[in-house]
UniProtKB/Swiss-Prot annotation:
Entry note: cofactor: Binds 1 pyridoxal phosphate per subunit.
Descriptive protein name: Acetylornithine aminotransferase
Subunit field text: Homodimer.
Main location group: cytoplasm
Gene Ontology MF term list: identical protein binding; N2-acetyl-L-ornithine:2-oxoglutarate 5-aminotransferase activity; pyridoxal phosphate binding
Lineage: Bacteria, Pseudomonadati, Myxococcota, Myxococcia, Myxococcales
Gene: argD
Binding of pyridoxal 5'-phosphate, residues: G121, A122, F154, D239, E240, V241, Q242, T297
GO biological processes: L-arginine biosynthetic process
Organism of derivation: Myxococcus xanthus
Remarks, miscellaneous: May also have succinyldiaminopimelate aminotransferase activity, thus carrying out the corresponding step in lysine biosynthesis.
Length: 401
């Protein structure tokens, strides 16, 4: 064993860490299922990141609405480091305090009663879908299994969640898709009403369609969905993966309409970059997921949960989310000023709430995004013609300018 380990070459010692070499190495070894710009990010602090060559970028996408407190937030770093020094992982066959504390924080903050932890938004949405099936069986109505979701929605990349997603481009090549999903126009309450049938079990909705172009439903849409679900005995499931954790200026997007969903999915900003997701639900629904019905080896991992506890504590501080609303209003105003200065129609729409803003152009955004990368700004597309801005909440007004 000793001789073998001594004879093994040191990959790190012999590797070329230049940008070009790393990009070529990535192309040799990684699946080529992402389109990435030709630079390698190396470190971050606050709302800024630096690449391997030392070039600085203002991060206006925050890991796709994930690094809500910016990069290397000192309180989150301290929480994760302290947990690394005590306990990394035990799986969910044992209790761990960070997970218990996080469940208590999230249920109190959301108004829901039970938490299940996983590792991503897709897994959280899978949990919602499985919960729906199990609840309907426990109610004695197993024939009710269909979920209504919406055109242009996005709920994840697993086979079930990509089927729930209302965008054919993400489903292409993965047919046959699982049965049990119906898509209707977003914001059209009458279309939802017509789609409800004997097999309908739930409605799955995003308060704002982030990946669908930062599309906002008419005010009152969620209220209407809640009433429709109550009328027909359906579950109202709200995907808060992108809109939750304060992104819209309230703890969760559904709170803008004053409703209480049956279940929600949370991820992205929950761990500020560490992988963690959660499904939160009402007490009576959570009773359906008994031991053995669902699980996750890594879900609610002590280190990720410790970081998430720090995130939630910070977000819950008095006045913190008020600042998110103020900065969001400022970003929207500045984007609309730019819209007014450019030739008519160049910017077709500016949409958003809080620090989730979409700027829709009259042409494809890919060349524009490549250009702003060169200028030291990180943004992302939300559809072919919309640029998504989801900066860290700690971004300053000066940085937004």
């Amino acid at each position: 064993m000793t001789a073998l380990s001594q004879s093994e070459p040191s990959l790190s010692a012999s590797s070329d860490s230049s940008t070009d070499a790393l990009v070529q190495k990535a192309k040799r070894h990684l699946l080529q299922n992402y389109k990435q710009p030709p630079f390698v990010l190396a470190r971050g602090q606050g709302a800024r990141v630096w690449d391997m060559d030392g070039r600085e970028y203002l991060d206006l996408i925050g890991g796709i609405a994930t690094c809500a407190l910016g990069h290397c937030h000192p309180e989150v770093v301290a929480a994760a480091k302290a947990q690394l020094d005590s306990l990394w992982h035990v799986s969910n066959v044992f209790y761990s305090q960070p997970q218990i504390d996080l469940a208590a924080q999230l249920t109190e903050w959301s108004g829901l009663s039970r938490a299940f932890f996983c590792n991503s938004g897709a897994e959280a949405n899978e949990a919602l879908l499985k919960l729906t099936r199990k609840v309907m069986k426990d109610r004695g109505t197993p024939e009710r299994f269909e979920v209504i979701s919406f055109d242009s929605s996005f709920h994840g990349r697993t086979l079930a969640t990509v089927t729930a997603t209302g965008q054919a481009k993400y489903q292409k090549g993965f047919e046959p898709l699982p049965a049990g999903f119906t898509h209707v126009p977003y914001g059209d309450l009458e279309a939802v009403r017509k789609a409800v049938g004997p097999a309908t079990a739930a409605i799955l909705v995003e308060p704002i369609q982030g990946e669908g172009g930062v599309r906002m439903a008419p005010l009152g849409f969620l209220v209407g969905l809640r009433a429709l679900c109550d009328e027909h005995g359906l579950l109202l499931l709200v995907d808060e993966v992108q809109t939750g954790m304060g992104r819209t200026g309230k703890p969760f997007g559904f709170m803008h309409e004053g409703i209480v969903p049956d279940g929600i999915s949370v991820a992205k900003a929950l761990g500020n970059g560490l992988p963690i997701g959660a499904m939160l639900c009402k007490e009576e629904l959570g009773a359906s997921l008994t031991p053995g019905t669902h699980g996750s080896t890594f879900g609610g991992n002590p280190v990720a949960a410790a970081a998430a506890n720090a995130v939630v504590r910070i977000l819950r501080r008095p006045g913190f989310l008020d600042e998110v609303q103020e900065k969001g209003a400022y970003l929207l105003a500045r984007a609309r000023e730019l819209q007014g200065r450019l030739p008519a129609g160049r910017i077709q729409a500016v949409r958003g709430q809080g620090l989730l803003v979409g700027v829709q152009l009259d042409h494809k955004v890919a060349p524009v995004i490549a250009q702003v990368h060169e200028e030291g700004l990180l943004v992302n597309p939300a559809g072919d013609r919309t640029m998504l801005f989801a900066p860290p909440f700690i971004v300053t007004v000066r940085e937004l300018d």
